[in-house]
Structures are given as C-alpha cells and as structure tokens.
Design a protein with these regions (language model features):
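Intrinsically disordered, low-complexity segments
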Residues: 2-5, 16, 22-23, 54, ...
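Short, glycine/serine-rich, charged loops/turns that create anion-binding
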Residues: 111-112, 205, 215
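Short, threonine-centered small-residue motifs that mark membrane-proximal processing/anchoring sites
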Residues: 7-28, 175-205
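C-terminal membrane-anchoring or membrane-association module
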Residues: 209-217
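Bacterial Sec-dependent N-terminal signal peptides
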Residues: 1-10, 217
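Surface-exposed, well-ordered secondary-structure segments
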Residues: 26-190
Length: 217
C-alpha cells in the first residue's frame, strides 16, 4: 500500500503487427504515439493498432501523454511529442521481439531514481545476457525550453552487442522513470516517428489524476 501511494506522486502530473515481421537487421523506432494516455502498450506494435513490427510488451507497460496536450504526463522536452512509455504497477517492463534484432539498441530516458536496462538472447528476459545499461537519475538536470513538466531532461543512451536479442528488461522504480524513441538495430536512438516501411510537487510521471482514477474503483 505504501508503494502505491508513492507511485501516484510520479510520472503523472500532480499540478495539476498482420504485416511481415521485422527483419533482425532493420532499424526501427518506437515513439508510442497513438497508444493513448495510460493505455497498455501491449500488442500495439504487433498489429493491434500500430505498425506490425512483431514487438510485444508486458501487461504493466503503459503509454503516457504530455499534460500540455491533455494527458496525465508530468514531463517536458520529450524527444518525440507527445507520448512516452513507463510502468506504474511494477518495477519493470519486458519487451519481446520474436524475430529478434541485431547490432544495437538505444533509447531516450528520464528518471528521478536510478534504473537498469538489460538485453537478453531469449524471450521474456531468458537466455544469455547480451548487454546492460545503468541509468542515472537526471530527470530535471539543465532543463530548458518546455516550461511544463518535472521530467524535462531526456538522455540518449545505447549499446552495441554481438548476437541476436529477443527481449529487453526495463527496470526501475514504478512511476519514476520514462522511456521514448526505443530503437532496434542501432546504438543511437532515432528522433523521428516510426517509418511506415519498416511544478515539482510530485516527482513521479503520474500524480493526482491517477489517484482520483483509483479512488473511483
């Protein structure tokens, strides 16, 4: 219960694929636009509403839309407006790519608490560990531009690896870390949408809006 109360002070603002699967060598960028505010990402990139890239996310993985455009997101300066990915009810999100991908992996992130990302050979975080990244807390460092949203610093990070990866484990404190422009096949994150051919009252990404939502249940 204590963890639940902590979570609602996070990334939500207090202040207010039927197409062929992606080849393992293709460079793909996931921006999460179109998933919808606080909706599960789930199979969106596996033919359920978005491009069919053969990419699935664990049930805890949610999309979050910037409060500037009517969502509950407590963030600013996101690399591709206006949606990011985060998790609220767990301390990790799992991404699976059944066909696998090679070369590298990269993304932008913003975090109030440290996190980790691990790349695995098998699905669901199984098999050999191919690469790992430690993510430092940096959510409000040297922010400029967009004045609304506590999570205003988005850092690009990536890693190259040998072999074929099929899953990624995004770890961190629930509601205190967000991700955007997740990129497969490159250790430099993309800053463009997915191609068709291929107020510090609350430090979390979601705040009072989510608290009210739970109270109604």
């Amino acid at each position: 219960m204590k963890q639940s109360k902590k979570s609602v002070l996070g990334l939500v603002a207090v202040v207010a694929l039927s197409a062929p699967t992606v080849a393992s060598s293709a460079v793909i960028v996931l921006t999460f636009e179109g998933v919808g505010d606080l909706n599960p990402v789930g199979e969106f990139y596996n033919g359920d509403g978005g491009p069919n890239y053969g990419v699935s996310f664990s049930p805890e993985t949610l999309a979050l839309v910037d409060s500037d455009v009517g969502g509950n997101g407590n963030f600013a300066n996101e690399p591709s407006s206006s949606t990011v990915m985060f998790f609220l009810e767990a301390d990790e999100a799992i991404l699976n790519v059944a066909a696998g991908f090679t070369t590298g992996f990269s993304f932008f992130y913003s975090a109030a608490e440290a996190g980790t990302v691990r790349v695995y050979e098998g699905l669901n975080g199984a098999g050999a560990l191919l690469a790992s990244l430690n993510l430092a807390a940096q959510f409000n460092d040297r922010c400029v531009g967009d004045p609304t949203g506590a999570y205003c610093n988005w850092t690009a990070i990536g890693v190259a690896f040998a072999g074929t990866a099929r899953s990624i484990d995004f770890g961190g404190a629930a509601n205190f870390i967000g991700f955007d422009n997740i990129t497969f096949g490159s250790d430099t994150p993309g800053v463009v949408p997915e191609p068709g051919s291929l107020a510090l009252l609350g430090l979390g990404l979601v705040g009072l809006a989510m608290g009210r939502r739970r109270a109604r249940r």
